[in-house]
């Protein structure tokens, strides 16, 4: 049993190491090659492919290809296309165009996004075969995914790859290792006798009937609105921190030179704040917990707008990273638990799919594109020569952009408090 737990720990570590190599630093690279105005598109594509690729790969895993093998195939393809994106960056340097870089990146992301769910399936199957309780055994294993994400961020930060195409090669390398490793994992048998389902049932669309319930409808709408916040800091926090490097007085500041490391505090906080959820849900209930999440997002954005790389401003940056854990966990995990407790067992999995679709699909996509429009309005690209090389930064009125994001989260939180009707009963938590 210890052996299978360790093997699943390695798998989860690698899955999220692939993601951590670029998710929080890609914006820096794009900004450095004068492509800052397209950051939103690179992050929106994650939401777009999340709308259909996990469901499609889930069908393939159920009927034709064992989940562990499909996991390996997806990571091999994702790594190959990410390496091609890195090659384009290496070959053309700062002259690389959107058309040369984006297609390879988009295809890579399309094959990567389903692997999170596939990894969960492999884990659940292996733990069940070993006679272990998945509810108790899986969370400690999943924590190592976050550790992999953080370690990958640190590697990219301290090697200096955060500023260049090399981060894409790091992601590809992790992916290739996992592609090989996945084929050694315990077999997940396919169900060749699976019944033919309708299109509606196959894609879990029957769960959309939940929108007929007024309270669930309000919940899902606000899930979409809060989901708009999710990719904002992933896409723009580190380019914002790096923008201070344009100004001589901040060029050597720790927050500028180690922007990705500073950002990783967010992931550490996310890991620790998971431990607070049971207490807060029991004590306050889902409504107050989600209101806290909206408030935390507002503070997250406000602290970024008010901060600076030195002195008390650096303290505000650190506070922004710490409060991210509350903002993310109190919404994503608590919201998922609410859906689980308030839907019929026959559509519970599909309902979770709707929740993820509203947040990481529609919400993240619309949020990325809207955030890009705001950032483009208040900032502009500018370059300077550093060590004989032209480096681009996105500079301008960043604080106003962050304050707009903070105001959005605050207003949506107030509307949620008014419109979401819920009576907390502690004994049900």
Model features per residue range: what roles?
Residues 1-2, 186-221, 246-251:
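Juxtamembrane intracellular "pre-TM" segments in multi-pass secondary transporters
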Residues 1-51, 215-252, 258-262, 332:
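Helix-loop boundary and gating motifs at the non-cytosolic
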Residues 41-62, 261-276:
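Central cavity-lining transmembrane alpha-helices of secondary-active solute carriers
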Residues 56, 85-90, 175-189, 361, ...:
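Multi-pass alpha-helical transporter architecture, strongest
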Residues 62-76, 280-294:
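Cytoplasmic membrane-interface "Motif A"-like loop-to-helix N-cap segments
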Residues 76-95, 295-311:
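C-terminal ends and interior cores of transmembrane alpha-helices
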Residues 158-174, 373-409:
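A membrane-interface helix-boundary motif in multi-pass transporters
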Residues 288-335:
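C-terminal transmembrane helical hairpin of 12-TM major facilitator-type secondary transporters
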């Amino acid at each position: 049993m210890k052996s299978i737990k360790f093997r699943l720990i390695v798998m989860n570590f690698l899955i999220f190491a692939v993601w951590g190599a670029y998710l929080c630093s890609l914006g820096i690279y794009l900004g450095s090659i004068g492509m800052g105005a397209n950051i939103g598109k690179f992050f929106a594509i994650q939401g777009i492919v999340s709308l259909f690729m996990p469901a499609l790969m889930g069908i393939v895993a159920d009927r034709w290809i064992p989940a562990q093998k499909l996991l390996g195939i997806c990571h091999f393809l994702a790594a190959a296309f990410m390496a091609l994106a890195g090659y384009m960056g290496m070959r053309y340097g700062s002259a690389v165009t959107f058309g040369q870089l984006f297609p390879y990146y988009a295809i890579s992301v399309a094959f990567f996004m389903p692997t999170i769910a596939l990894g969960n399936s492999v884990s659940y199957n292996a733990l069940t075969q070993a006679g272990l309780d998945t509810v108790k055994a899986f969370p400690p294993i999943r924590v190592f995914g976050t550790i992999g994400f953080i370690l990958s961020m640190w590697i990219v930060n301290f090697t200096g790859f955060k500023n260049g195409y090399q981060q894409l090669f790091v992601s590809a390398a992790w992916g290739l290792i996992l592609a090989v490793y996945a084929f050694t994992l315990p077999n997940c048998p396919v169900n060749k006798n699976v019944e033919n389902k309708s299109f509606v049932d196959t894609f879990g669309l029957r769960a959309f009937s939940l929108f007929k319930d007024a309270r669930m409808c309000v919940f899902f709408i606000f899930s979409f609105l809060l989901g708009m916040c999710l990719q904002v800091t992933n896409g723009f926090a580190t380019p914002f921190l790096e923008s201070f490097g344009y100004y001589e007085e901040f060029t050597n500041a720790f927050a500028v030179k180690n922007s990705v490391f500073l950002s990783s505090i967010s992931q550490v906080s996310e890991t620790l704040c998971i431990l607070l959820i049971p207490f807060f849900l029991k004590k306050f209930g889902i409504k107050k917990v989600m209101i806290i999440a909206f408030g935390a997002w507002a503070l997250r954005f406000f602290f970024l707008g008010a901060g600076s790389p030195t002195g008390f401003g650096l303290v505000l940056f650190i506070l922004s990273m710490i409060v991210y854990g509350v903002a993310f966990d109190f919404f994503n995990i608590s919201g998922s638990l609410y859906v689980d407790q308030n839907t019929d067992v026959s559509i519970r999995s599909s309902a979770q799919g709707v929740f993820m679709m509203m947040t990481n699909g529609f919400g993240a996509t619309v949020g990325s594109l809207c955030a890009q429009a705001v950032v483009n309005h208040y900032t502009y690209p500018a370059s300077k020569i550093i060590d004989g090389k032209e480096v681009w930064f996105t500079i301008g009125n960043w604080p106003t952009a962050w304050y707009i994001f903070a105001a959005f989260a605050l207003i949506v939180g107030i509307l949620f408090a008014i419109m979401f009707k819920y009576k907390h009963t502690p004994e049900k938590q």
